[in-house]
């Protein structure tokens, strides 16, 4: 029996490797995805004042730091019973959308586009963002502009473009200025157009690679995402599971997550394998992220993105089970984030200074959930009478997807090795 090891994995926000064990006929018998880094943040925050934690946990991820900041502060809000002013909620949401715009542009154009724009058979030495810049400079310029504007939104609302600091229990420590609002409004229509341009690019590439999209990494799983009144929502208040064939839905609130999510320990990875507890392991394995969000929602919350979602469903089905379709789903979300950001920037409350409610530290248990760029993100803290964290649980977005990524790699390997 032979073995193929791919290490390190590239274009990965972290560290990992893949091992493929081959049977005597040279076909893949077993595939393992190893996540080889131990983080430890659940232990780091124990003994800390809870109000400090939203400034610690952004270090979990250099790309999704804003999502961790906001999920964390929402968890502390819930533990202490804070009632957040409407203006603070809107400014927090804009901060979150800025991170989504920045990260979704990075993920598609920097990590995925080299394979589509240059082709999967291109020399690996040029199959990267530098190669995209050489081959399609206008595409690269738009990607860079979207990242810049997204980061400017985070800075305007979060105080810093990297590791924001304004989220505090009860709201925000500062509000966005009218000057920053006006600067962002002047650019947002261009970002919406760039979002549409990205979708047009992806749809043209789909025609070339549709056979590959429909054959590699196609697996049946459950899907988990956030909705608000059934609509797609990055900052939503309701979690929804959808079954592999779309026939069954389960909805629950963040505080109920332990009733619905279980975690299975495997020997070959530091990551625990989450699953739908109502279904069991492994039948209840599920996916999160753009594909899942498109699959679980009844509709998008913005008009241009909703038209794109309908077209997506016609192309890939509903629910879509093709892993490579994550890329088009991500671009639909990128467009939606730009549309929603415009709505918020035109709302007078986006520059209101009423962004802080009084809140006192106390004993409590709170869960904060947001949709991070890679998928649904959970932070759960318990605090004592002095507001000190005594217990913490975090399920980061990529963790949900690790077991199903392993399944998708297994399926892709079987297809690729079928004819040796």
Swiss-Prot record:
Keyword Oxidoreductase among UniProt keywords: yes
Cofactor(s) this protein requires: Ni(2+)
UniProt KW Transcription regulation keyword: no
Enzyme class, spelled out: oxidoreductase
Signal peptide feature range: none
GO molecular function: ferredoxin hydrogenase activity; nickel cation binding
Domain of life of the native organism: Archaea
Pfam families on file: NiFeSe_Hases (PF00374)
Keywords, ordered alphabetically: Metal-binding, Nickel, Oxidoreductase
InterPro entries (UniProt xref): Ni-dep_hyd_lsu, Ni-dep_hyd_lsu_Ni_BS, NiFe-Hase_large, NiFe/NiFeSe_hydrogenase_LSU
Binding locations of Ni(2+): 61, 64
UniProt EC number: 1.12.99.-
Subunit structure: The F420-non-reducing hydrogenase vhu is composed of four subunits; VhuA, VhuD, VhuG and VhuU.
Family that this chain belongs to: Belongs to the [NiFe]/[NiFeSe] hydrogenase large subunit family.
More info: The large subunit of Vhu is split into VhuA and VhuU. Each contributes two ligands to the [NiFeSe] center.
Protein name from the UniProt record: F420-non-reducing hydrogenase vhu subunit A
Name of encoding gene: vhuA
């Amino acid at each position: 029996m032979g073995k193929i090891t791919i290490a390190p994995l590239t274009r990965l926000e972290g560290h990992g490797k893949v091992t493929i064990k081959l049977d005597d006929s040279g076909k893949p018998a077993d595939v393992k995805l190893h996540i080889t880094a131990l983080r430890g943040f659940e232990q780091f925050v124990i003994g800390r004042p809870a109000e400090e934690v939203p400034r610690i946990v952004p270090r979990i991820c250099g790309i999704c730091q804003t999502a961790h900041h906001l999920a964390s502060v929402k968890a502390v809000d819930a533990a202490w019973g804070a009632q957040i002013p409407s203006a603070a909620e809107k400014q927090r949401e804009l901060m979150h959308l800025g991170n989504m715009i920045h990260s979704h542009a990075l993920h598609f154009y920097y990590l995925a586009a080299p394979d589509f724009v240059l082709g999967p058979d291109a020399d690996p030495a040029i199959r990267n963002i530098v190669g995209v810049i050489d081959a399609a400079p206008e595409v690269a310029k738009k990607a860079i502009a979207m990242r810049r504007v997204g980061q400017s939104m985070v800075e305007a609302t979060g105080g810093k473009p990297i590791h924001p600091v304004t989220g505090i229990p009860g709201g925000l420590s500062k509000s966005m200025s009218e000057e920053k609002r006006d600067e962002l409004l002047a650019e947002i229509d261009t970002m919406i157009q760039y979002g549409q341009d990205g979708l047009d690019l992806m749809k043209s590439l789909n025609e070339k690679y549709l056979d590959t999209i429909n054959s590699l990494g196609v697996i049946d799983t459950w899907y988990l995402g956030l909705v608000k009144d059934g609509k797609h929502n990055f900052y939503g208040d309701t979690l929804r599971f959808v079954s592999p064939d779309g026939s069954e839905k389960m909805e629950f609130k963040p505080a109920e997550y332990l009733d619905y999510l279980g975690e299975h320990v495997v020997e070959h990875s530091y990551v625990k394998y989450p699953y739908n507890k109502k279904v069991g392991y492994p039948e209840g394995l599920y996916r999160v992220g753009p594909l899942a969000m498109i699959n679980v929602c009844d509709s998008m919350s913005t008009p241009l993105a909703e038209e794109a979602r309908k077209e997506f469903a016609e192309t890939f089905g509903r629910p879509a089970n093709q892993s490579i379709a994550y890329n088009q789903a991500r671009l639909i979300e990128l467009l939606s984030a730009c549309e929603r950001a415009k709505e918020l920037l035109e709302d007078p409350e986006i520059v209101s200074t009423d962004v802080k409610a009084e809140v006192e530290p106390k004993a409590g248990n709170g869960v904060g959930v947001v949709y991070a760029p890679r998928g649904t993100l959970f932070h759960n803290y318990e605090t004592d009478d002095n507001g000190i964290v005594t217990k913490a649980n975090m399920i980061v977005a990529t963790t949900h997807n690790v077991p199903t990524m392993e399944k998708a790699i297994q399926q892709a390997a079987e297809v690729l090795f079928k004819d040796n």
